[in-house]
C-alpha cells in the first residue's frame, strides 16, 4: 500500500493548512449529514456518525457546523439534502486503477464533472466492475508516531478490536481492519492513549502499479483534479510510488 499510504498521510498533513480548507470542511460536513440521515442523529448508537464527527473535529470543523449537519440529517432542522452515493471507475496514466467515490444531489452533474476531470488529465472512465475488483474495502486508522511507539505497541492495543495488520507508513502507523471493525479499532486506539489522526473506510489495492517520476506526476495531477470536485468525497488508486519518486514529484 506504500504509494497510496504515503499520499494519504501527505494529504492529511497538508489538510490543516490547505488554502482550500473550506472545500474540505464542506465534504466532511456532507459526510456527517449523510451518516445522521442513514443511521440517526445519536452518535452513541450510530458508529458511522461517531466516526464522521471525530474526523470532522480532527480537521477543526467548528462544532456548530457539525451540530447543524447532524440535525439536518436527522430531520431536526430543515434544509437537508438527499445525497446519492455513487462510485466511478477509471484508469489513469501508467495503467493506474482509480475509484472515485461521490456524494451528490445531481447524478448527471457528478458524472460529467468526473469524466471531464479524468479525461483532461490523461485518464479514461472505465465500465463498472472493471476496476473495483482490484481493491478491497477496509477500515484504515492512522496513528501518529509518538516517541518510543512501536508497531508492536499499536498492534497490542488494537488486535482484540479487529485489527488485521499494522504498517509503518513514514510519519504514522496504519492499522488495517475489516470495514465493519473501523469504529471499534478507532475506539480501542483512543482508549489506549494513541493519537488517532484519521479513521476511514478505504478501498485498498490488492495489486499495485509501480511508477517512475513522470507518470507519477501525471497520476497525482489527475487525482488532485478529481478530488477538487464538489461532488467527490474520496479517490482511491493503486499506484506504488517510492519515497524517492515522491520527492522528485514534489520538487
Swiss-Prot record:
User: Which InterPro entries does the protein's record reference?
Assistant: Integrase-like_N, TACO1_YebC-like_2nd/3rd_dom, TACO1_YebC_N, Transcrip_reg_TACO1-like, Transcrip_reg_TACO1-like_dom3, YebC-like
Q: Where is the signal peptide?
A: none
One GO cellular-component annotation of the UniProt record comes to: cytosol
Gene Ontology terms, MF aspect:
DNA binding
- What are the alphabetically sorted keywords of the record? Cytoplasm, DNA-binding, Transcription, Transcription regulation
Compartments, as annotated in UniProt: Cytoplasm
GO biological-process terms attached to the record: regulation of DNA-templated transcription
Official protein name in the record: Probable transcriptional regulatory protein Francci3_1368
The organism is Frankia casuarinae (strain DSM 45818 / CECT 9043 / HFP020203 / CcI3)
Q: What is the lineage of its organism?
A: Bacteria, Bacillati, Actinomycetota, Actinomycetes, Frankiales
